């Protein structure tokens, strides 16, 4: 994302992020 801003936990409940032991690897929307 270019020009995006970080959000607080629970601020956008329809977004998901998938993590494995190495860190973030995928994201999406519900």
Curated annotation (Swiss-Prot):
Q: Which InterPro entries match?
A: Peptidase_S1_PA (IPR009003), Peptidase_S1_PA_chymotrypsin (IPR043504)
List the keywords (alphabetical).
Blood coagulation cascade activating toxin, Fibrinogenolytic toxin, Hemostasis impairing toxin, Hydrolase, Protease, Secreted, Serine protease, Toxin
* Gene3D superfamilies, A to Z: Trypsin-like serine proteases
Please, which domain of life does this record's source organism belong to?
Answer: Eukaryota
Q: What is its EC number?
A: 3.4.21.-
**Localization terms from the record:** Secreted
Alphabetized GO MF terms: serine-type peptidase activity; toxin activity
- Listed GO CC annotations: extracellular region
Q: Which residues form a coiled coil?
A: none
Q: Is Protease tagged as a keyword? A: yes
Which GO terms fall under biological process for this protein?
A: proteolysis
| Tissue spec. comment | Expressed by the venom gland.
So what does this one do?
Answer: Thrombin-like snake venom serine protease that cleaves alpha-chain of fibrinogen (FGA) releases only fibrinopeptide A. Shows coagulant, esterase and amidase activities.
**Protein family membership:** Belongs to the peptidase S1 family. Snake venom subfamily.
Q: What is this protein called?
A: Thrombin-like enzyme LmrSP-2
């Amino acid at each position: 994302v270019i020009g995006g801003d970080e959000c607080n936990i629970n601020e956008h409940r329809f977004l998901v992020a998938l993590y494995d032991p190495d860190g973030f690897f995928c994201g999406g929307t519900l």
